[in-house]
Each structure stands twice: as C-alpha cells, then as structure tokens.
C-alpha cells in the first residue's frame, strides 16, 4: 500500500493524462516522436505528473506506439509516472524490460464484450491480472499493476450493466494482485447519478486504497460525470489534452473528457491540482501542430477562464 499511496496520495486528487495512449489509438494524424516528447515535457512542466504513455502492442499494427520505449525513457528522465497498456503476457514481459512504472490490464464488465473484443472470458481476464501481478512481483516489485473495468456503465453489445458485477470484478482484480482498480465509461453511456452511485460503492470496496475513473465525453456528460465522481470518493481521474481520443466500440465518440476542463472544474470545487492552465495551453498547441486535421475540444480553451477574476491553480509553481 505504501508504494501505491506514494504514487496516488489519498489526501488529494490525481489527474492522469491519457492522451498519449487513448488519445492516439484512433488518431488519423499521428504525431512524430519528437512532437510527443515535446508535448510530454511541456505538460509535465505544467504540473502534470501521471501519463498513460502508450500500449505494448505490435508496432506493425499500432505504429502510434512504436516509440513507446523512447517515450518511457523520456518520462523516466523527467521523473514522470508512466503507465502502459499490457493486454497479455507478452505485453507484460515487454513492459517489465522498461522503466515503465505502471502496467494497465483491462477486464470487461460484460461477457459478450470480453469475448468479442478481448477473445477471452472475464474469468480469464481476471486470471491474466493475477499472472501479470506475479510476473511483476518476480521481476520488478516496484511497478504497479492497474486493472481497469471496461464498459462499467453500459456495454455497446449487452446494453445495461449491473453495478454489482462491476464491484465484484473490481474486488476479484484486487484479490488477484492488482494494486489499483479503475472503472471506465468506455462508450459514454454514463450520467452523473450512475457515476456517483458506482463511485460510492467502489470507495467502500477500496477503503483507504484509491481507485481510478476513466470518462468519455461522447454525449457531453464528461465534466458533469467527473464532478459526480469527485463528490463520491474518486481521487484519480483520467482525461486527455483537448479531449483527444475515441472508442472503437462507439462510432462517433468524441473522445475522453477534456483535461483542461477537468483541471478548472476540480479547482472550482476546492480540489487543488497544482497544474498550470497556461502550460496546458502551450502543450495543446504542440499537440495541435503535430496532428493537423485532428479534432480537439474544450470549453475552457474556447471561452478562457472567467474575466475580471484572478484564477490560479492552487499549489501551481
């Protein structure tokens, strides 16, 4: 638990930038490695410390992650916490050979989605979490294992999802050896009431252990859902710069909840982030220039902070 609470302190919120992984998985214009490094560095300088930096997947099929080793090395040099998606033992072995600090596994909330998109049952997915944790324990016990529950608020195949199943799977992943679990609104079905209720249940399950919520803004509910999550025990939120991203299971999905908007919302609710909005704006400019034609989002980017007021992120340098 000590290692976990050092990375994700329970007494404050943590925002994870997932744009370099989730934000690029469906991107048409892929940024060059140099641009990704500049993006990472500028956002890190703005106070962002946690980055989901890529996926350990075959470079021939996923060229956007071919430079993951280089990105991990840069993150390590900058003392940023890096996480990478590990979908099988081969990915875990690759991750263990790097300086990645967190390995992310995925378990689907529904059997139909698990079989259709991961080619394994939910039980097998939980067992994989256990095997990844065992590999970690043997080779690099300082690394964290993160188990994310996909389709936690609704499934593109099965429809409604029983919250009891989500909580059960989260508990099973913790029992299997995961250090931290997360719940994902993968296809953007959730509303604030459902988010608040499930976060409250997960908070009870996890106790002193933090959990992650991963939100998409498919139907414009992302920022309201993030606020509901904070009000009900969530202290780690995934977001992406400019709302980059999409979901292969949700045609027309507009991506993740916007990182800049989440920072502004959290500060307005009294949750210090230590993140500088001006620095985020500069990082966004780097990403936009590197990805011509890609759609970026954000209410704060469009309107700016409120006029005639002094807005400053609490704790920002």
Give residue spans per PLM region:
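Catalytic cores and adjacent flexible loops of soluble metabolic enzymes
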Residues: 1-317
């Amino acid at each position: 638990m000590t290692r976990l609470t050092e990375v994700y302190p329970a007494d404050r919120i943590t925002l994870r930038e997932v744009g370099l992984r989730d934000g690029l998985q469906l991107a048409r214009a892929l940024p060059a490695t140099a641009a990704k490094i500049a993006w990472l560095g500028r956002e890190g300088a703005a106070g962002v410390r946690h980055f989901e930096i890529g996926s350990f997947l075959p470079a021939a099929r996923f060229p956007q992650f071919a430079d993951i080793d280089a990105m991990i090395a840069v993150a390590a040099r900058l003392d940023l916490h890096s996480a990478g998606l590990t979908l099988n033992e081969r990915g875990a072995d690759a991750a263990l050979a790097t300086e990645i600090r967190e390995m992310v596994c995925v378990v689907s909330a529904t059997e139909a989605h698990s079989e259709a998109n991961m080619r394994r049952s939910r039980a097998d997915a939980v067992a994989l979490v256990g095997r990844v944790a065992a590999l970690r324990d043997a080779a690099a016990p300082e690394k964290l294992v993160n188990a994310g529950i996909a389709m936690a608020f609704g499934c593109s195949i099965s429809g409604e999802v029983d919250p009891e199943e989500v909580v059960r799977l989260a508990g099973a992943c913790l029992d299997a050896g995961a250090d931290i679990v997360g719940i994902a609104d993968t296809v953007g079905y959730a509303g604030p009431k459902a988010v608040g209720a499930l976060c409250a249940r997960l908070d009870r399950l996890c106790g002193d252990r933090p959990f992650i919520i991963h939100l998409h803004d498919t139907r414009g509910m992302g920022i309201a859902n993030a606020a509901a999550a904070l009000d009900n025990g969530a202290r780690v939120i995934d977001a992406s710069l400019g709302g980059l991203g999409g979901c292969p299971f949700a045609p027309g999905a507009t991506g993740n909840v916007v990182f800049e908007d989440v920072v502004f919302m959290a500060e307005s609710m009294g949750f210090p982030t230590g993140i500088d909005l001006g620095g985020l704006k500069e990082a966004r400019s780097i990403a936009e220039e590197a990805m011509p034609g890609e759609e970026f989002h954000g209410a704060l980017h469009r309107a700016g902070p409120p006029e005639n007021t002094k807005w400053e992120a609490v704790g920002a340098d």
